[in-house]
């Protein structure tokens, strides 16, 4: 028994005998000598090869060269090269795993490497200083593995193009330092651990092997496998080095400071070092070990800081954002997809959640195609009660099922207005609509579109349903429509924008005008169903009653005809012939929804004697349930007005205005010029816009003349930036409101585009059917091109922002527009030298508080900014001291005066359209010149590119209300008396002329700070708001109403001078199809009026009655007639214009 035990111990000692220093040096030197000698040999061969190549180039031909170029040797050499090339190609196919054999080879190498590493782990249980005998069974297995590695190393060496680069690769170094010691162990009949721990670096091939095996397919799994392989290979390799040096000790101390440490303890030490947490139970004692720990700690800080948090984030995001949304019964939610970024989400949430917390009962599910960034994730956490983020794509039905889009109230698709390729952005969003509609055809879609011509694809989707709430928000159409309205009526762009912008930021105004402007910014467009007690009353009667009793400004209604095929739509300021029906929807300008509730609660019985708006609440009166037709509407109105008159006797409220018969006759006579011209104008088949035959680009392209600049006057100059490769911004959307049919042909202003001819040529195919459009090749950055367009006499100069460019800075996106504004703003114009001021001059030269006029004025300008934060550049150019010190565009002085516009607020329309799509319809009606969703479908068909085919179509399209900017003294508003307050003016203009006053355009009162007499916008002033003589009034004017007054002192000599100037202008532009605007005698004898169109419809039988009355009263009018000469001259000019128009009754395209 004792002998057996002794024999076993002697056998173990034979297997684990001590390794001498010479044996360890032999193992290490075999690796280093192989590496160094191989590298030296490769360098020598490369040096010799380069020397031979260089010598061949210098010598040209020689004995050796001729020897190599002889016939037989050359053929053998070419054959050898061919064989070598094919052999290398085969090896490369194997090593790249492109074939099945190659995949098996790569996988086998990885598996054998892991097997060799496992053998190292087994052998590491023995002391490092011991050598295993060749009787150890793991040594032959490891020898076989390394023999295969040698074969694989040779294949890789032959396939490498750069041998030296291959020799220095990490996998090559691993093979060089692990394969030679194996063969040395076979020779010495003993094995030593040595540097075999380097085999752990083969773990870096793990992601590639898993991809070959199709084990991982997603990007997250590939990223995770890569991070895991890096961490494990680093840990195992570093632990092997610590295990070697700590068990061997420092060589110069001959191992006296060594310690017995296992490989597991080394791994533990490395992990503790990587996490920068050391407990001190396992430490390095050797100098080599401590030096290695110092450098490894620095590397581990980078590794731990970069890779470990990313791994944690991968696990967290996978669990957090790949789940499904649980749609609970009775819980409302919407799905938002598309451009999910920090800016878009912030803008959407700010507008969608701007209601009170108790009123928000809709959850928002964001469907993003990529995991949210840390900043976006923070936003979602701030709105955790309302938002949920799901990672997925609207293109995949699986992801749509995960967000339960079929149960959602609506699906909102966000676009990126600052993208470099707007067409691609639109197409991707349209594809999302197709995917959602194919998945569930009943899902309501609200989509943002950047370019207007891409809208046509959406109504063609079979399941698209306007009646179900599907809606399109077109940025180009609305943005350019706003700018066009600012050209027609100065300040109107700011007026309309302020109604759709809600400011939550508190600002303390320093001046009186700032206080008025900021208070007016509180107003919004709100809708409310009208009380049934208004049924049977006319719109002016209801608007007056709401204004006086409820302090509400009613501007429009949703009219539904009682006939089956009658009109149904929105009407701005309907005429008195339109009667209010039950359940009519009204549009108000008010501050809060609570205020407009009064229009629903109003009761003619309970609230007849109530004159405090806050007391008009829901009365619950039984009479409200009865049908209102039992009481005539006239009696109700008389009763209400009687109560109002008795109440206003002791208060400052505006009294009812009465007009004398002479004034009414004067007003009726003024409507005549419009009706005479209706039938002579050429319109499109819808009757909404002025139309003409297609005009070639050459006929409207203006040439630079050295003698005289083009005789434009009171025209619109549009500065456009772009080239042949720029994306189209859709100038048709800018032109259409300026060519609305509720202007006569003489009232149309010439439009001159200044820009690159290559760009405008691409836009011209959408503009060629509109009259009086001209193109001046050039650039708005050069004053010479501006003077060529006679910018001194223009009514408005518009600077449109250039199309977005790839990888452009958000700050520099408006650089060209800002520089153009600087150039235009530097132009000083002497207004005293003009014989007859233009429209813009009339506004800019209005008298101030001291009845003085400025002799020098600047060109009226309206600039578009894509980036609202660039407003501080425009503020510096404003020339107005003491301005609002704000970086917010909508709180800036430039915005308050109507000189700047940005479409950034259009993002809020997405939430507005979801809550109340009627508001979006009203906005489209106001800014587009009357384009509706139904009309858009027809405009894209060739058959409507012609003239109106009937008088009915023409009248139904033209008789739309339009907005204007009227003076208190030079227009028919001077007939309103008294007009000391806004309430008095509102009631008087509505009673006398049917004109609806909605706001003011007032001169900034501080003269020393406002040398240019700039005006600011006041939206919906209070009823008691005091008026100033210099105020201009924003009004909704009926189409048939002429707002100018006759100039009694107009001389015939002045008429002759203007006619002469007009004829010269016509001769100057004889080479174009449509000459610039020519002012006839009748036009110049009236004060100009700003006006703009908006889509309304009314009962047109009243207009025919009015025209009959005009013809009857024209013979007995008391107005002083113009001289016979003036009448003849005016008729002559009208005839000339008709003769020169070559596009009368054009054919369809």
From Swiss-Prot:
Motif residue range(s): Selectivity for potassium: 276-279
Extracellular topology ranges: 1-24, 123-138, 185-188, 248-259, 283-291
GO biological process: fertilization; potassium ion transport; reproductive process
Domain RCK N-terminal: residue ranges: 331-473, 713-884
Intramembrane: 260-282
Cytoplasmic topological domain residue ranges: 46-101, 160-163, 210-226, 313-1149
Tissue: Testis-specific.
Activity regulation, short description: Regulated by changes in cytosolic pH; activated by alkalization. VU0546110 acts as a selective inhibitor. The auxiliary subunit LRRC52 shifts the activation of KCNU1 to more negative potentials at a given pH.
GO molecular function, one term: potassium channel activity
GO cellular component, one term: sperm flagellum
Polar residues: bias regions: 1106-1120
InterPro entries: Ion_trans_dom, K_chnl_BK_asu, K_chnl_Slo-like, RCK_N, Slowpoke-like_C
The keyword Zinc belongs to this UniProt entry's keyword annotation: no
Keywords for the protein's UniProt record, in alphabetical order: Cell membrane, Cell projection, Cilium, Flagellum, Ion channel, Ion transport, Membrane, Potassium, Potassium channel, Potassium transport, Transmembrane, Transmembrane helix, Transport, Voltage-gated channel
Compositionally biased intervals (Low complexity): 829-845
The UniProt record lists the keyword Transmembrane helix: yes
Protein location: Cell membrane; Cell projection, Cilium, Flagellum membrane
Reactions listed under catalytic activity: K(+)(in) = K(+)(out)
Membrane topology: Multi-pass membrane protein
Segments passing through the bilayer: 25-45, 102-122, 139-159, 164-184, 189-209, 227-247, 292-312
The family this protein is said to belong to: Belongs to the potassium channel family. Calcium-activated (TC 1.A.1.3) subfamily. KCa5.1/KCNU1 sub-subfamily.
Domain observations: The S4 segment, which is characterized by a series of positively charged amino acids at every third position, is part of the voltage-sensor.
Subunit annotation: Homotetramer; which constitutes the calcium-activated potassium channel. Interacts with LRRC52; this interaction changes some channel gating properties, such as shifting gating to more negative potentials at a given pH.
Function recorded in the entry: Testis-specific potassium channel activated by both intracellular pH and membrane voltage that mediates export of K(+). Represents the primary spermatozoan K(+) current. The channel underlies a pH-triggered membrane hyperpolarization during the process of sperm capacitation, as sperm encounter the alkaline environment near the ovum in the female reproductive tract, thereby playing an essential for male fertility.
Protein name: Potassium channel subfamily U member 1
Provenance organism: Macaca fascicularis
Lineage: Eukaryota, Metazoa, Chordata, Craniata, Vertebrata
This protein's encoding gene: KCNU1
């Amino acid at each position: 028994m004792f002998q057996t035990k002794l024999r076993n111990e002697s056998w173990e000692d034979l297997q684990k005998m001590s390794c001498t220093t010479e044996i360890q040096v032999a193992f290490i030197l075999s690796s280093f000598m192989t590496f160094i000698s191989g590298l030296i040999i490769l360098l020598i061969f490369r040096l010799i090869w380069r020397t031979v190549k260089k010598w061949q180039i210098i010598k040209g031909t020689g004995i050796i060269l001729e020897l190599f170029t002889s016939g037989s040797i050359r053929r053998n050499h070419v054959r050898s090269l061919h064989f070598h090339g094919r052999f290398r190609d085969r090896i490369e196919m194997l090593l790249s795993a492109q074939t099945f054999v190659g995949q098996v080879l790569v996988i086998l190498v990885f598996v054998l490497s892991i097997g060799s590493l496992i053998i190292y782990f087994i052998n590491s249980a023995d002391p490092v200083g011991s050598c295993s005998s060749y009787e150890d069974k793991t040594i032959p297995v490891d020898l076989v593995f390394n023999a295969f590695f040698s074969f694989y190393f040779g294949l890789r060496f032959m396939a490498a193009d750069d041998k030296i680069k291959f020799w220095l690769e990490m996998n090559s170094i691993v093979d060089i330092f692990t394969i030679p010691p194996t063969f040395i162990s076979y020779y010495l009949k003993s094995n030593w651990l040595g540097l075999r721990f380097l085999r752990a670096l083969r773990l870096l091939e793990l992601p590639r092997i898993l991809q070959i095996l199709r084990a991982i397919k997603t990007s997250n799994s590939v990223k995770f496998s890569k991070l895991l392989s890096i961490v494990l290979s680093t840990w195992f390799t570093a632990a092997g080095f610590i295990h070697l040096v700590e068990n061997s000790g420092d060589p110069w101390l001959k191992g006296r400071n060594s310690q017995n440490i296992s490989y597991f303890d080394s791994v533990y030490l490395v992990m503790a070092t990587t996490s920068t947490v050391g407990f001190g139970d396992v430490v390095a004692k050797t100098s080599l070990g401590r030096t290695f720990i110092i450098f490894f700690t620095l590397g581990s800080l980078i590794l731990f800081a970069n890779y470990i948090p990313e791994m944690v984030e991968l696990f967290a995001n996978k669990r957090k954002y790949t789940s499904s949304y649980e749609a609970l019964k009775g819980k409302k939610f919407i799905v938002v997809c598309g451009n999910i970024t920090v800016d878009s989400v912030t803008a959407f949430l700010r507008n969608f959640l701007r209601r009170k917390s108790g009123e928000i009962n809709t959850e928002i599910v964001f469907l993003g195609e990529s995991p949210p960034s840390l900043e976006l994730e923070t936003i979602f956490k701030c709105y955790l009660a309302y938002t949920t983020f799901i990672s997925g794509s609207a293109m995949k039905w699986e992801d749509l099922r995960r967000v339960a889009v079929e149960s959602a109230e609506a699906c909102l698709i966000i676009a990126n207005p600052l993208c470099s390729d707007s067409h691609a952005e639109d197409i991707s969003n349209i594809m999302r609509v197709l995917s959602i509609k194919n998945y569930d055809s009943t899902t309501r879609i609200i989509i943002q579109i950047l370019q207007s011509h891409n809208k046509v694809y959406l109504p063609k989707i079979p399941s698209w349903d306007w009646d179900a709430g599907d809606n399109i928000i077109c940025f180009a159409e609305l943005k350019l429509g706003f700018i066009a309205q600012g050209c027609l009526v100065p300040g109107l762009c700011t007026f309309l924008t302020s109604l759709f912008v809600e400011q939550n930021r508190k600002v303390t105004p320093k001046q009186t005008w700032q206080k008025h402007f900021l208070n007016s910014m509180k107003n919004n467009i709100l809708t409310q169903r009208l009380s049934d007690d208004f049924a049977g009353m006319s719109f002016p009667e209801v608007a007056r009653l709401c204004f006086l009793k409820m302090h509400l400004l009613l501007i429009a209604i949703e009219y539904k005809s009682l006939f089956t095929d009658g009109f149904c739509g929105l009407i701005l300021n309907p005429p008195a012939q339109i009667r209010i029906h039950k359940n009519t929807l009204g549009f108000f300008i008010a501050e809060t929804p609570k205020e407009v509730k009064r229009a629903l609660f109003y009761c003619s019985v309970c609230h007849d004697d109530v004159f405090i708006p806050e007391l008009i609440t829901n009365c619950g009166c039984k009479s409200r349930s009865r049908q209102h037709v039992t009481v005539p509407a006239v009696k109700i109105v008389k009763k209400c007005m009687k109560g109002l008159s008795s109440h206003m006797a002791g208060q400052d409220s505006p009294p009812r205005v009465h007009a004398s018969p002479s004034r009414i006759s004067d007003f009726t006579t003024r409507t005549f010029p419009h009706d005479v011209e209706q039938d002579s104008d050429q319109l499109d088949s819808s009757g909404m816009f002025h139309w003409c035959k297609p005009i070639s680009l050459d006929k409207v392209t203006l040439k630079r003349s050295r003698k005289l600049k083009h005789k434009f006057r009171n025209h619109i100059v549009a500065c456009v930036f772009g080239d042949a490769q720029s994306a189209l911004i859709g100038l048709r959307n800018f032109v259409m409101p300026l060519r609305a049919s509720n202007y006569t042909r003489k009232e149309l202003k010439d439009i001159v585009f200044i820009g690159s001819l290559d760009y405008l040529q691409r836009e011209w195919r959408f503009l060629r059917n509109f009259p009086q459009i001209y193109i001046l090749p050039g650039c708005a950055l050069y004053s010479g091109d501006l003077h060529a367009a006679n910018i001194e006499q223009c009514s408005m100069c518009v600077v449109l922002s250039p199309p977005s460019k790839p990888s452009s800075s958000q700050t520099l996106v408006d650089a060209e527009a800002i520089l153009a504004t600087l150039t235009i703003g530097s132009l000083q114009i002497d207004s005293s030298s003009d014989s007859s001021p233009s429209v813009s001059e009339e506004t800019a030269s209005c008298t101030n508080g001291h009845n003085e006029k400025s002799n020098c004025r600047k060109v009226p300008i309206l600039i578009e900014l894509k980036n609202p934060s660039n407003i501080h550049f425009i503020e510096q150019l404003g020339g107005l001291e003491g301005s609002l010190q704000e970086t917010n565009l909508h709180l800036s002085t430039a915005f308050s005066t109507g000189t700047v516009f940005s479409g950034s607020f259009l993002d809020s329309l997405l939430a507005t359209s979801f809550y109340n799509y009627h508001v979006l319809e009203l906005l489209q009606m106001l800014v587009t010149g009357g384009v509706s969703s139904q009309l858009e479908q027809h405009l894209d068909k060739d058959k409507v590119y012609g003239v109106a085919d009937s008088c009915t179509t023409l009248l139904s399209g033209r008789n739309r209300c339009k907005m204007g900017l009227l003076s208190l003294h030079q227009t028919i508003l001077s007939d309103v008396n008294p007009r000391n307050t806004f309430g008095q003016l509102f009631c008087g203009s509505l009673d006398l002329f049917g004109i609806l006053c909605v706001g003011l355009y007032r001169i900034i009162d501080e003269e020393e700070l406002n040398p240019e007499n700039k005006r600011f916008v006041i939206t919906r002033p209070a009823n008691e708001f005091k008026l100033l003589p210099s105020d201009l009034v924003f009004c909704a004017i009926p189409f048939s109403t002429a707002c100018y007054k006759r100039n009694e002192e107009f001389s015939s000599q002045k008429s002759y001078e203007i006619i002469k100037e007009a004829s010269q202008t016509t001769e100057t532009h004889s080479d174009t199809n449509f000459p610039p605007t020519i002012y006839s005698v009748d036009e110049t004898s009236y004060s100009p009026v700003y006006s703009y169109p908006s889509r309304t419809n009314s009962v047109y039988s009243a207009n025919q009655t009015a025209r009959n009355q005009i013809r009857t009263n024209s013979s007995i009018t008391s107005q002083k007639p113009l001289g016979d000469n003036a009448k003849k001259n005016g008729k002559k000019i009208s005839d000339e214009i008709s003769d020169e128009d070559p596009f009368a009754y054009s054919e369809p395209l």
